[in-house]
Amino acid sequence: MEADEFLVKEGAFVNDYYTQKAREIAKFMREKLGLSFDNAEFRLVNNDDMAESMATYGDPLPTWATGQNYIISRTEMMDLHYSLYEMVGHYTYDSFSNGRKFIVYINKSDREHEILGVIAHVYGHLHMDKNNFVCADNLSDLSKHSALRRRYRKLEELVGSKEVERVFDLGQTLAGLIDLYPTSRTEKKQEYYSTDKDSPGHDEYDVFDFVLKNVTMLPWEREILEMVKDIYSTYRTVRVKIMHEGFASFVQEKYAEEVSKTDIDTGLKMHELLYAIANPLNDSQMPYAFGLRLFKDIEKRWNEGKHGLVYSQLPRQDRLEYKTDEKRGMEKVLDITRSCSDWDFIFKYCDEDFMDKYTKETLDMLEVELRREAVERDEKYEKSWWYKWIMRYTRERTDPEELKLELLTRTESYSPTVYIPKGGFNNQEGLTLKQDLSVLDRYVNSTDPDKREEELAEVKARFAEQLTVTNGFTYAALSRVSNFIKLPVRLQTIDEEGNDITIVADGEDVYAE
């Protein structure tokens, strides 16, 4: 291991003890588990520095949004006693190793077993960032952020902060309209400007990119939008949110098990820390809880040969009793981290047996929690989406395939997709946007056209709550785009009940047709 690999710093000084531990954990991850990851520099920081790091990670430009995020994060940490264990920041170029080095922030108020568990957790994130096909091409280079900030300040001097923020706000809006799934669409894209009615010549899913190429704007406006697009390309990594947190928690538990072999007390504390975070009784912790347990289940199934066509055709009881000594669990887990998005992860590997185990464990934990607090189940948890999700599976016996999509939408791993349909832009009629609801086709079974329409209407109604974008944020976004391009903007979508609706922004008002 190189002399500058995996340094742990507190201020300007290297913490020798934690640096040695970080290197020992890295060696365990690489040699025992087979992980591969880039170099990292761990920085022990206080809550104020952590809040600043969180704010500038998402918005490295010196904007109102960065300041707002900092104030919110700092208030939560300092006044509400909320604590963030770690944050993996952007990478920078490491000249010594001729490769990438990630900057990782760890809360220095953490206890020793927490810091060591967090370092193990971070190595899981770094493995995903290096190897997963979604993450590898959608990370932001920290080394250019300072140059972007200087240029942003210069533009404020040239045209005024209000003008710059107006375009920045538009950029934030368009950042939600990048193509989250570019690898799934292989049509060759047009690269030339056109005002014909067949522009674009195909369905265009990267609305941000299309606006940059086809809308007339001032050079400084284009420069700001290009800055924002570059920075917000990291949004695509939401496609692996469950896998990211699940795999990091998975290897964190592996390290806790290793520690337990020689130090039971510390190993137990590490397990308690992990399962306090990967808690299925908390809406916000679902990516950790579900991802961890699904990775563990996959490892067990591939260790015991419980997979494949022959196994899947066995009766339920025979599947439970089936077991071979295959020992390919970790190999399979690593293969998934490289080749899958959350969509593949959930739809391919979350089978009925796992759903039964997961819901049983969650309900057992719930009963313990309720006995301790002496409250009625529905009284405390009826508004939690995870509780409704579990009840739909156990009480209502909802199709697991529907519940999988809901899980993906609730954890941001599948966001509503908006695109420009073929011929949806010209200088007379404006810009037409359409919500892509093709994801619902998997729940329509009939081949008869009339019946398919009826079934699709029913499916839209069932998923309307998760997929509708008819809210104040959408109205404001459409108005912002319309004012910038000086043309009407129409969005074809569904309302809260699943009915087709078109929202129009004409530069003065926003209304539904």
What are these regions (language model features)?
Residues 110, 138-142, 197-200, 233-247, ...:
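Active-site metal-coordination segments of metallo-dependent hydrolases
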Residues 87-101, 215-231, 267-268:
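Active-site-adjacent bridging/hinge elements
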Residues 6-11, 100-108, 228-240, 273-280:
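Glycine- and acidic
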